[in-house]
Amino acid sequence: MAVDTMESVAVVAVPFPAQGHLNQLLHLSLLLASRGLSVHYAAPPPHVRQARARVHGWDPKALGSIEFHDLDVPAYDSPPPDLAAPSPFPNHLMPMFEAFAAAARAPLAALLQRLSATHRRVAVVFDRLNPFAATEAARLGNGEAFGLQCVAISYDLGWLDPGHRLIRDYGLQFLAPDACMSKEFVDFVLRMEEAEQGAPVAGLVMNTCRALEGEFIDVVAAQPSFQGQRFFAVGPLNPLLLDADARTTPGRRHQALEWLDKQPPASVLYVSFGTTSCLHAEQVAELAAAIKGSKQRFIWVLRDADRADIYADASGESRHAKFLSEFTEETRGIGLLITGWAPQLEILAHGATAAFMSHCGWNSTMESLSHGKPVLAWPMHSDQPWDSELLCKYLKAGLLVRPWEKHADIIPAQAIQKVIEEAMLSDSGMAVRQRAKELGEAVRASVADGGNSRKDLDDFIGYITR
């Protein structure tokens, strides 16, 4: 592709302001910029800062290849997560979601108009929770909109047709959205979709690959609601690191990586529940007892869900302060407890890591599978129960810790320990670990020369620069 053709197209990435969404669009932006495209990333100021600070797996200099833009929105409440809430969904983020949806359109429209005047084409890649971006792209004489699928494409099949043959044949269960999300958020999503209904969308870019969801990609592409859209399965968007990369991270290395360097191969359980989930104190105690009882090496990231603005003041010490002190002393030499941000990609790529106990967010699921690590599935909310179904029943690269029907219960230590020991010590666990390793190799092949994801990325770039 000629350089002038590439430079005459502006790509504008418009993420939804939550960590798993910010991260995926920044990875895609970096991929496109590495291919010579002019890429612009537009989000509220604290979320631009958050995305830049937390991205892992790239040379820090790569961020200089992207132009970042602030979408100013009015002040909003940024409370801590409500630990007494009846639902595990992070409803404390709703004031920010509402403020963003109401105010981000105007500064985005102004940015698109400026870029439209100086480029042959403006390709707007928007998180599908931001349908207003498609409407604004359509207002340009030279604009096109492409949705970014930040969840499994199979999740869309469940949303559109929960009784579909493919779901039935594999014994999968799709939960209605209001069973695992708050009513406020479901209403918000439906309201956004209804307001922007009819906005033309040229295609769908998916953070998945045929090695994981090939059957579902074909079935969803044939659904009437996607008629006329081009499908580009370009995942995984996250960088694929090697064990050597995890051992030679440039700059000052995180303590977790230095600790992993000293552990035997495939001996460590990594435990983390993402950025939008909290565990009750009673559940923390049961999980701690299970980890100790299993006598397995571990890295445990214990932190509460993000605030809407992660840079807002958080007063006081951790609510787990007493536990942290005692547990750290009791497990000294066996494991590592982290209360801040952890370099998850590098941890999963490290040869000492054997398995990942996870909330099953799609970001974490893709990162784990692309590095050949099985998942001990503990879904918390949103699409996560579906991801656990996909992992455990369809891909057979996961073991279920907590069935969704018990999501309101405290899971006892004995039940958790049993799954840890199955994953780390048993023949059946070894089979799951081997299956995850095979999937990891297939996922890596998909982004290598000649792979399906590489071809789809080439096709996407070719289409927007045509």
UniProtKB/Swiss-Prot annotation:
Its EC number is 2.4.1.215. SUPFAM superfamilies: UDP-Glycosyltransferase/glycogen phosphorylase (SSF53756). Pfam families: UDPGT. Disulfide bonds: none annotated. The active site is at H21, D127. An anthocyanidin binds at H21, N91. GO terms for biological process: carbohydrate derivative biosynthetic process. UDP-alpha-D-glucose binds at A342, Q344, H359, W362, N363, S364, E367, D383, Q384. It comes from the Eukaryota. GO terms for molecular function: cis-zeatin O-beta-D-glucosyltransferase activity. Keywords: Glycosyltransferase, Transferase. Gene3D superfamilies: Glycogen Phosphorylase B. Belongs to the UDP-glycosyltransferase family. Utilizes UDP-glucose as the sugar donor and catalyzes the formation of O-beta-D-glucosyl-cis-zeatin from cis-zeatin. May regulate active versus storage forms of cytokinins and could have an impact on seed growth. This is Putative cis-zeatin O-glucosyltransferase. The lineage of its organism: Eukaryota, Viridiplantae, Streptophyta, Embryophyta, Tracheophyta.
